[in-house]
Amino acid sequence: MSHNVEKITDAKVFKEKVQEGSGPVIVDCSATWCGPCKAISPVFQRLSTSEEFKNAKFYEIDVDELSEVAAELGVRAMPTFMFFKDGQKVNEVVGANPPALEAAIKAHVA
């Protein structure tokens, strides 16, 4: 099974896929220099391929590449996982905490 995390590098694409999208969406807001981001990235990748979460869309943004998007979302620490439902932000998990991330995804796609 392939990884289902798509990297978004353009603010317009972010708006189209996340803010104007439908269904459950999870966005990993991270940075290349962030150690905890690198540590939890394989967990996020694994969760994105889970049959249990097949109806959710998984995206990643680099807060340095998309600083205007990160500012608009209010990202203050990395990693921050943002949860959207039909374009509306409904939850977030801050920090590299695999159990909290998995629990939040389960609640989000239920």
Swiss-Prot record:
Presence of keyword Zinc: no
Gene Ontology MF terms: protein-disulfide reductase activity
Gene3D superfamilies, A to Z: Glutaredoxin
Coiled-coil residue spans: none
SUPFAM superfamilies the record matches: Thioredoxin-like
Pfam family, one: Thioredoxin
Active-site residues per Swiss-Prot or TrEMBL entry: C34 (nucleophile), C37 (nucleophile)
Keywords: Allergen, Disulfide bond, Redox-active center
Disulfide cysteine pairs (residue numbers): C34-C37
Record site feature (Deprotonates C-terminal active site Cys), residues: D28
Thioredoxin domain mapped to chain residues: 1-110
Reported function: Participates in various redox reactions through the reversible oxidation of its active center dithiol to a disulfide and catalyzes dithiol-disulfide exchange reactions.
UniProt similarity note: Belongs to the thioredoxin family.
UniProt-recorded name of the protein: Thioredoxin Asp f 29
Species of provenance: Aspergillus fumigatus (Neosartorya fumigata)
